[in-house]
């Protein structure tokens, strides 16, 4: 079952910053279209979380208060500046319309989904093992990406970027490596896949790296199958918008 309160949380946290930046649209039709669009996205995401909670229970996966606390602390440090708890609460309320309790619920849901996405994606595990084997054989990440094709995503920074760059945790991981060293696999900070990172160069505050990403796809595949088969019964009517 999807909690209506989760749907409202997701919707308000999405629409509030948009309205603060853009204001309400003058055209009533456009404004209604925007609201319906974000309501649809919020309901889809609430359904995703409900499925994740079900799979977490079936697979004995849990998220602890400590894990939620640690994630919130990381968010308070985004940009390299640690905000006070009161300052962070004000940001949540002013920018997203959320209380700390509501924010904790959103973090909890996202962590559950991350754990489930990782646990059920055997294809990603097998592909990561293949990448690890190729690294051990002496191959570079670029060569590995050329061999595996669209199964992986290869990226280069193309130069030095800030070590606090918002990039799924790659910059911070690269900062911990020696020049030319390739990291072990790690889960992206957004929980949507595995990364391998190679350090090209670094200074005290900047870093240049290359990376390979293996996306988690099994969770999305299952949700698409569920939606396409009509197994989701929605008690509130929000049409899918055609752009």
Each language-model region and where it sits:
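Short, positively charged
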Residues: 30, 161-170
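Residue-level marker of structural boundaries
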Residues: 16, 77, 150, 228-232
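Secretory-pathway/luminal and periplasmic proteins that interact with or process carbohydrate-rich
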Residues: 77-85, 142, 151-157
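PPIase-associated folding chaperone regions across multiple families
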Residues: 87-136, 140-146, 166-243
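N-terminal targeting/tethering segments
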Residues: 1-98, 102
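Short linear loop/turn motifs
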Residues: 67-76, 149-150, 156-163, 239-242
């Amino acid at each position: 079952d999807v909690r209506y309160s989760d749907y409202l949380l997701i919707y308000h946290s999405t629409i509030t910053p948009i309205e603060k930046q853009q204001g309400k649209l003058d055209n009533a039709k456009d404004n209604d279209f925007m609201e319906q669009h974000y309501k649809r996205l919020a309901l889809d995401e609430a359904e995703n979380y409900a499925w994740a909670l079900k799979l977490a229970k079936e697979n004995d996966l849990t998220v602890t208060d400590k894990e939620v606390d640690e994630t919130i602390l990381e968010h308070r440090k985004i940009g390299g500046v640690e905000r006070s708890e009161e300052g962070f609460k004000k940001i949540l309320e002013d920018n997203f319309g959320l209380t700390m309790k509501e924010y904790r619920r959103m973090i909890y849901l996202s962590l559950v989904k991350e754990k489930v996405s990782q646990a059920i994606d055997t294809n990603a595990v097998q592909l990561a093992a293949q990448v690890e084997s190729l690294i051990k054989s002496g191959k570079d990440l670029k060569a590995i990406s050329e061999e595996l094709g669209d199964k992986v995503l290869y990226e280069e920074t193309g130069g030095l970027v800030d070590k606090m760059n918002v990039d799924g945790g790659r910059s911070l991981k690269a900062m911990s490596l020696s020049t030319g060293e390739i990291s072990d696999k790690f889960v992206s900070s957004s929980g949507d896949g595995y990364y391998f990172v190679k350090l090209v160069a670094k200074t005290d505050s900047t870093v240049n790296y290359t990376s390979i990403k293996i996306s988690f796809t099994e969770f999305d595949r299952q949700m698409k199958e569920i939606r396409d088969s009509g197994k989701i019964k929605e008690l509130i009517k929000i049409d899918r918008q055609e752009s």
